[in-house]
């Protein structure tokens, strides 16, 4: 699992700026394209992308597309979970969305979202559990860590695909020197561990997290992927004062109706969230 940090966005930023992208992406988590083959969908989106784009790295994109041999869900997952162009570039674009770059998102994130949707619907294992605990260790800037601290009790979301693991990472060390070599960590960076309490029965997210360990390049990590714009509630933070290798722990959970009722109704968050979510479901 990559240990590159993910920036979250607040509910206000989501509703004011990112919601329109989420709505466009949400259609791929529906049955709209259910009868299309993966390679047909890629061909359709790719041609549209090439015809409308003015980017200079088309050759690089074409080379990436050729790695998806027949557009099977296995290949989508392997390319994403491996050390490839897709994982890093796709999430980088998703974290910095604007109207111009959405051409990329439609091409890359759309078919991958669609593949995950098909995989989840065809895999009975997705519905076996009602609740789980997921973990994600990552390195973030101190300034971003401060945003987590002031957002305790708030609803946040990640605009990128969020990889987590069912492995209890509190039992594993995370050497600072190795992390520095991999991610070029500086004195202005900090290591954190997200512990996410996931309840699929009460969860208000549009789409569930999806287990991809069966086809993942790192199957031993028991990887689960949360789709873009999945919402979480920051419950509390436990700061470690011991070894520098110990991460600060950020406790989070998937939102439910009780969480929404705790919001400041004067700001209209509960009403606005439900309205946006209903629009997504009807798209």
Residue ranges of each PLM-predicted region?
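Mono-ADP-ribosyltransferase
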Residues: 1-283
